[in-house]
Amino acid sequence: MILRRSLCLLALANAAVCAHAADWPNFRGPTRNGISVEKGWRTTWPGDMPVAWKAEVGLGFSSVVVSEGRAATAGYADGKDGVFCFDAASGAVLWTHRYPAELGDKFYEGGTTGTPTFEGSRLYWLSRWGNLMCLEAATGRVVWEKNIAQETGAPIPTWGYTGAPLVHGDLLVLNVGDAGTAVEKATGRLVWKSEAKDAGYSTPFPLGNLAMFGNAKSYVAVNMQTGAEAWRFRWLTEYGVNAADPVLAGGDVFISSGYGKGGARLKLQGTQPPEEVWKTKALRTQLNAAVFHEGYLYGVDGDTTQKSPLKCIDFATGEEKWSESGFGSGGLVIVDGNLVALSGMGEVMIAPASPSGFKTSARTQVFGPKSWTAPVFANGLLYCRNGRGELVVLNLK
Amino acid sequence: MKRRQFLQYAALSGTSTFLAPFVRSAEPRKLRTALIGSGWWGKNILKEALASGRCLPVALADVDANALEIAADQVQDLSGHKPKLYRDYRELLAKEKPDVVIIATPDHWHALNTIEALKAGAHVFVEKPTGHTVNESRAMLKAAVESGRVVQVGLHRRIGPHHVSGMKFLKSGAVGDVGMVRLFAHSPGDGPEKPAPNEKAPDGMDWDFWCGPAPLRPFSKKLHPGGWRNTLDFANGTLGDWGVHWLDQVLWWSGEQYPKRIFCAGGRPVLGGAVLNDKEQTSDAPDHQVATYEFEKFTCIWEHRRFAGNDTEKHKIGSYYYGTKGVLHIGWKDGWTFYPTTKGGKMEHEDSQLQEPDGHNIQILWADFLEAIDGRKKPVASIELAHRSSVLPLLGMISWRTGRSIQWDAAKEQIIGDPAANALLSRPYRGPWVYPSV
């Protein structure tokens, strides 16, 4: 174990050395943009889908995180939320941490919505209901836990807290309250909080010292150390659902919401409010944020209630380049220049990320609907989960 | 110049350049349309109004400034027209004098909104059930009759294609003699219900106004958005929300206008006792109910469960008509299906034809409303019919509240020999709002 850790440190200099160089330790991956640069995996396979392992994790739409040979996610069953940790290679259950929780089936099946965060020997988890905890990654032992909603008095938004904890130095930055909340990651001690108003559903995204995320009525940027608000960009969306993470591209950022709202490219200006470059109705990301690759955005346009298309839009203009109909409210990641997408109906599709069209090299029906969770790629394994809690891991090595 | 004179001159002149502007103005004037309650469902209806090409969205009213702003954006996207925005529906009606008003507020507001809109001279499309209590519904009917305006109620299952064909099949005698009808809506769910904290209402929302004539409850996400359906101050639970659609179908099929006797049992054994204190609250509608409606020629049972909804039974929502030749299920997304009981009987089925994503038929109901406004027909879900249908779940709720069976005198619209139950035909209003008079 010690040897492996030191190898990983060396890996900073040479990624190929470490077995876990291509970990996916937090929501949206190592660089928080849905991109993995991992090479040497296959974009096509003959015959049946190459299943590495399968598991049942309960109801919900939590994504998977992968670090140092472990894979974790969450789900709900029998009156309890569960945080599950698996051996990434074999799928053996390393530990499970369960606690009483509500189903929360408000206009959908219910279950967990957020995603845990690995950092070193710890796993951090914020539940829909405000249960915030630090678990030992190796054992699942509770290092500390609390209910952050109760402690701060922040209201729980309609579908609960969904943003994953962001580790920043000694702090965990959370999308809780009007403009975030931070606790000490070692102890859970509250460091700063914001007004007791509804949070949005996105994960705090670091921009230097600032974290940017959606609240009920805008995207806000706050200083991560102090909680001081730098700016807010008014972004009124139906039911306060600002869920998609900001997508950073150069010095600009793309924000987008569903319910017909649309997207906008904003020019970032440090601690000054950003300036709108363009707006579009061509890409309205209700749940999963788009992914940026070589001048283009790829993402799902529309709501869970529709058979939404997968689209490519030009980041320079906001214009649509192509639209693949019937994709549904799934998600995608980009791995070494390839779109690795999981449709709302549970079909994996792999295609080169290109503005000229969506030409798949592989398509496999992994499970049934609803799969609203973007797939995760780490160390040659593709992690897919659906709302019912089927977790299917494909081996693309 | 009077219009008729103008027409004569225009005809005489015979030049196309002179005629052109006149031809354009001869197109029917667009109906100045307003929406009261600009949430999810209100916007769905307004979208159909805009899609009809005959309605100009002049104004929106909502007690939530955020909901107004979002709706205004969508209306502008769809129509290119910027509606005027109002917090107070009374001000909207007084200033805009709309031709048509859509009412999609929670149930406890339907009566006051509708009556005021009719007084302002508008035709009204109001959501089901008509009233929150029986006498509100009666007052709405009275106001509609006095105004001479068209009132269409959002009972889109009166016109939905598979309901129309299912009814035709049923009335053809193909199901035989029907002696019993079972209506139901089941969903999966868990218990006990955990209270949600009371909160400050969101910025921009006038919560006192939202509660209006109903008791002023503390704001909670249990209530808004959508959850008010299961809080009895504002609605009547699943029986009021879903039951009215299916009970309406029973009146349509049978031609009977009312049941003689009603008994309803139910409770919250799964969700647990209702909570309302200064810190938190739960919903308070029953998690299940069984209501028996005794008609002249058949018995009708309503049944809902907000737990244990799975595939044990083939259908989860809709109606079973039990006849001597078989069982007809008329459902929602699953269309209608006939299951014969006779040897050699043929199973028959027709798919639903619904508008997605929300599975309704508002588009054709709106078209029917416009035809009625044009004077070509009576609206298919008229206030007269919808009043009788809406009374049924409301009487079911009164039986459930009093814990005894009630007998309905439809001519007098009174419960026979039960003053305590009759008292529940109305309810006290919170001032300054005044209960409408019948």
Q: Where is each model-derived feature located?
A:
Chain B
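Contiguous beta-strand/loop segments that form the cofactor/metal-binding neighborhood of enzyme cores
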Residues: 164-165, 177, 182-184, 188-384, ...
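N-terminal glycine-/serine-/threonine-rich beta1-alpha1-beta2 phosphate-ribose binding loop
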Residues: 1-126, 132-150
